[in-house]
């Protein structure tokens, strides 16, 4: 332990620099609401016509004037913003305002103010891509997933979100969304994009991230209420799919502010009936086997989210509370036909009922940012349960019942302190995760499984501003993990120590070129869901099982990300994972196929991607092109996986999409979105490439734009049929999937609000007119 702490300190001690002169502070209004895009100009006290330095206030109303290149001992500051009286003061050239600067509202009445400010549509700073979401929105009917589809480096499919191949952590207004991907997709698909303000994409982990499950981060910032009032929006949507399948739902969002209390409450319901069909072909003992599966799944999903912030003056900060609850009630009925050489062997009926609930809550105290110090502490709880039942009957008179329950919880305790100086930011923090998961297969004696997971993490990081345009981030994280397993009344334990260093170099070479270089290494642990040993049957011929003996995988990353001409994002990188874990395809002693997660190989990947936005016809025609290319190579394969592999070297894969929208008027817009992916060759699997297109339109009433309609057509030519080839060693299986992707979707959004004042921000045309107006 002492060696680990000494290593962390020795990594970060060289970060402390000699700090240059700067003036920093925060600008707020009389109600202590931060003011963004206020103009701060520093002039000579002897000659007020001579501007020495200037800046605009940023997110949260904060500003920093760099005075290191000027010899003036004092400066006269002029702080102004439309709708407020100009503020004047004289300060030293190395001064920090301990209290926020409160601007007095102008006596001129304001119903709606338009402020012009310098703000790029896309930025690359601190290793994150920042995006003004207004540039990605098509209209009031857009949901958050629609916006993410148009963001650089983000790929959204019907069952996943990835950032350069990584499943990201999603953070909304500082709250980590600790929910499974399927639940998260339902929530984001229902959340209106009109509530978004900024979007940040971090494609690499830093010391502040856990060593597993947080390789990328998508941070969503919603709009804040500037005055007392409320805003209510409701979206109802319906989707008609092929074969009489459907999906419909309703989502309501309420945002309000009263005095020092502000918050939002959301609730939603989604009802779906989806039909699926799969076909499998494989040779078996010199015969051709064919399995055809058809199923109908009915699902009811409910969710509610409450997010509140209380900022009384005596707290000297804010108390933030978040709670979400999700229920997923799924019922699946299917029929399976088993054939040998085109002769029917048997028919099987399979019925699955799966009820899941998940509660997530978090309370946090965040101290006021004094521009020198900031502290936060939080407690979170994640708790859920799952009740799974499967009944199988076949034409041979056999019957099997499987009943399985799971429940668990996780306590999360976090604390973080940040020390800020004009050219240096130092952060230290602690994160603790205390978890327990139980699984019980009721129909099988001795099947009880319990796992306790305790993780204690300590991290430190420092960011130093080497020059005006060059900064260095160094960080280190250590984690201690303790596991205890109870399997069939037998207890086993394991312990792990992990240390991970992080380096990032951010360079703004010019107004048209910014670059970030990343170098990290870390130990990635498997999630405990993949370690639960209970079996789940998908057909009479295949099941899946967990593996409680999975080992961590060491991961090394190197990446360069560039922002060209203020809009084009280009990156290239490589990742090496030793002793990587994942699902493998096997055959048991009875000749039945099964999948099982295990450590199976070393994996080297090399990748590159590019995102190119464009705008024509005075901003009426907008779009973006995204391309991704990756190469995989496997080595040092596990002995039991070796006989069942395809190509181990030079497995190339590419995908891309083009988003094109035309908005001739403020109340009407259309879009098309063609996309493709090539054949994807993995170690035991080959996936056939596909190509398809989505299209749609949005319309808002001319006299009442708070009422809007949207019509979307997805996969109109039914091209997203999946064709996979799996290698089980003794034979390979070809699986065809006919998904519910061809559909037409209609939605209507209605908003009502009561705000005393709204402030709209227009972008500087010299900066963003070529992207969009």
Describe the predicted segments one by one.
Residues 41-43, 78-84, 96-135, 156-158, ...:
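Short, acidic, small-residue-rich periplasmic hinge/interaction motif at the N-terminus
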Residues 46-62:
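Short, acidic Ser/Thr/Gly-rich low-complexity loop/linker segments typical of extracellular
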Residues 145-180, 208:
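Extracytoplasmic beta-strand/coil segments of soluble accessory domains associated
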Residues 177-204, 252, 304:
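Short acidic/polar hinge/loop motifs at secondary-structure boundaries
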Residues 301-330, 349-488, 492, 506-516, ...:
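Face-selective signature of the C-terminal outer-membrane beta-barrel domain
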Residues 493-494, 523-571, 576-578, 594-607, ...:
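Outer-membrane beta-barrel signature, preferentially recognizing the C-terminal barrel domain
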């Amino acid at each position: 332990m002492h060696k680990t702490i000494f290593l962390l300190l020795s990594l970060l001690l060289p970060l402390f620099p000699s700090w240059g002169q700067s003036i920093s502070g925060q600008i707020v209004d009389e109600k202590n609401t931060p003011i963004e895009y206020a103009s701060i100009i520093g002039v000579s006290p002897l000659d007020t016509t001579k501007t020495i330095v200037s800046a605009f206030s940023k997110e949260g109303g904060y500003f920093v004037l760099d005075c290191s290149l000027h010899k003036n001992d004092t400066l006269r500051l002029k702080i102004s913003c439309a709708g407020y009286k100009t503020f004047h003061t004289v300060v030293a050239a190395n001064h920090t305002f301990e209290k926020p600067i409160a601007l007095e509202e102008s006596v001129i009445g304001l119903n709606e103010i338009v402020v012009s400010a310098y703000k790029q549509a896309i930025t690359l700073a601190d290793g994150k891509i920042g995006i003004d979401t207004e540039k990605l929105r098509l209209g009031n009917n857009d949901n958050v997933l629609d916006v993410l589809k148009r963001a650089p480096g983000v790929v959204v499919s019907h069952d996943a979100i990835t950032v350069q191949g990584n499943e990201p952590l999603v953070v909304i207004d500082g709250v980590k969304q600790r929910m499974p991907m399927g639940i998260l997709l339902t929530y984001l698909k229902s959340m209106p994009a009109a509530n978004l303000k900024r979007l940040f994409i971090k494609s690499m982990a830093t010391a502040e991230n856990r060593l597993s499950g947080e390789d990328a981060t998508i941070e969503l910032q919603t709009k804040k209420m500037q005055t007392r009032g409320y805003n209510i929006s409701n979206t109802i949507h319906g989707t008609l799919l092929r074969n009489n399948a459907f999906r419909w739902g309703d989502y309501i969002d309420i945002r309000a502010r009263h005095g020092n209390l502000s918050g939002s409450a959301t609730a939603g319901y989604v009802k779906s009936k989806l039909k699926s069909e799969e076909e499998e072909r494989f040779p078996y003992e010199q015969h051709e086997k064919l399995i055809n599966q058809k199923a109908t799944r009915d699902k009811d999903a409910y969710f509610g989210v409450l997010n509140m912030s209380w900022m009384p003056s005596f707290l000297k900060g804010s108390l933030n509370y978040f709670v979400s609850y999700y229920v997923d009630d799924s019922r699946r009925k299917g029929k399976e036909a088993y054939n040998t050489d085109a002769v029917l062997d048997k028919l099987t009926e399979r019925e699955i009922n799966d009820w899941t609930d998940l509660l997530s809550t978090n309370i946090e105290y965040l101290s006021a940012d004094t521009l020198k110090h900031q502290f936060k502490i939080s407690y979170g709880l994640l708790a859920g349960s799952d009740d799974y039942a499967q009944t199988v009957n076949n034409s041979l008179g056999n019957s099997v019942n499987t009943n399985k329950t799971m429940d668990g919880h996780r306590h999360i305790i976090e604390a973080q302190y940040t020390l800020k100086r004009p050219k240096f930011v130092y952060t230290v923090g602690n994160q603790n995760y205390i978890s327990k998961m139980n699984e019980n297969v009721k129909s099988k004696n001795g099947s009880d499984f319990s796992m306790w997971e305790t993780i204690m993490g300590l991290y430190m990081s420092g960011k130093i501003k080497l020059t005006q345009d060059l900064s260095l981030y160094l960080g280190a994280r250590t984690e201690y993990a303790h596991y205890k397993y109870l399997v069939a009344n037998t207890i086993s334990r394991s312990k792990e120590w992990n240390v991970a260093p992080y380096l990032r170099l951010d360079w703004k070479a010019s107004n048209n070129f910014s670059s970030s270089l990343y170098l990290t290494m870390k130990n990635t642990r498997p999630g405990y869901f993949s370690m639960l040993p209970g079996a789940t049957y998908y057909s009479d011929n295949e099941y899946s099982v967990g593996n409680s003996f999975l080992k961590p995988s060491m991961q090394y990353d190197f990446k360069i990300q560039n922002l060209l001409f203020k809009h084009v994002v280009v990156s290239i990188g490589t990742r090496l994972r030793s002793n990587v874990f994942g699902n493998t395809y096997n055959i048991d002693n009875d000749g039945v196929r099964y999948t099982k997660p295990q450590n199976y190989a070393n994996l080297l990947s090399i990748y590159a991607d590019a995102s190119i936005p464009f705008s024509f016809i005075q901003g009426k025609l907008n779009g973006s092109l995204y391309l991704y290319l990756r190469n995989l190579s496997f080595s040092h394969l596990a002995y039991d996986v070796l006989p069942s592999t395809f190509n181990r070297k030079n497995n190339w894969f590419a995908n891309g999409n083009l988003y094109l929208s035309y908005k001739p008027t403020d109340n009407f817009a259309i879009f098309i979105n063609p996309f493709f992916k090539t054949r994807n060759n993995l170690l035991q699997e080959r996936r056939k490439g596909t190509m398809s297109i989505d299209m749609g339109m949005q319309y808002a009433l001319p006299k009442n734009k708070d009422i809007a309609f949207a019509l979307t057509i997805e996969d109109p030519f039914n091209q997203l049929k999946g064709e996979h080839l799996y290698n089980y060693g003794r034979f390979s299986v070809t699986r065809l999937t006919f998904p519910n992707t061809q559909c037409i979707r209609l939605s209507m959004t209605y908003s009502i609000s009561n705000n005393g004042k709204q402030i709209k921000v227009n972008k500087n045309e010299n900066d963003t007119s070529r992207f969009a107006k």
